[in-house]
Amino acid sequence: MLYKEFDAATTPIEGRMLLEASAGTGKTYSLMRVLLRLLVEKGIELDRILVVTFTNAATDELSSRLRSNLTELIEQIRLNKSGSFNDLLDSWGEKKYSQDIILEKLQTALNKIDDAAIFTIHGFCQRILQDFVFSSKGNYDFEIGDDSNAKDKALSTFLRTNLPKAYPGYPT
């Protein structure tokens, strides 16, 4: 199947967006461009944008990259210099966006960077459960734990319990 090349600076950004591609193809780069465009072109506040990914490492990378992109873009505009955001600045210039308004939106986002909703799927679900526990009429005396070692513990217990029975003389 042939796919059209994705251009983060010009692709329409209305509605939902799914960005799917192989490793090393620039997904994070493109996602950051789309986020910056949502902030500037649509005036969406950073805490109103949801980014969901698979791993904790990816959430850390996205958060770090967003902070550095905002900082770098603000500096590029303030110093009126050429840089890695020329594509966006050219597009915004063609659309007659005011640099003062762009700077204000970007600085506001940078000031609220800790409110960015960048989660793993599990982290997002946990957040929803915590935020809406009362309206869900669910049990709010619950704890969300990490069961990542549960399988290893169960296997270890099973082997420790059953191997000596199956193989008398098996060292325990």
Regions found by a protein language model. Name each.
Residues 43-46, 111-112:
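Short helix-terminating capping/connector loops at secondary-structure junctions
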Residues 26:
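Conserved glycine(s) of the Walker
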Residues 2, 12-16, 53, 70, ...:
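Conserved ATP-dependent motor core of P-loop NTPases, especially the RecA-like helicase ATPase domain
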Residues 61-65:
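Short amphipathic alpha-helical segment within the helicase RecA-like ATPase core
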Residues 30-44, 67:
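Walker A/P-loop NTP-binding motif
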Residues 23, 34, 54-56, 121:
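Residues immediately flanking
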Residues 45-58:
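Conserved RecA-like ASCE P-loop NTPase motor core of nucleic-acid helicases/translocases
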Residues 1-22, 33:
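Conserved pre-motif I regulatory segment
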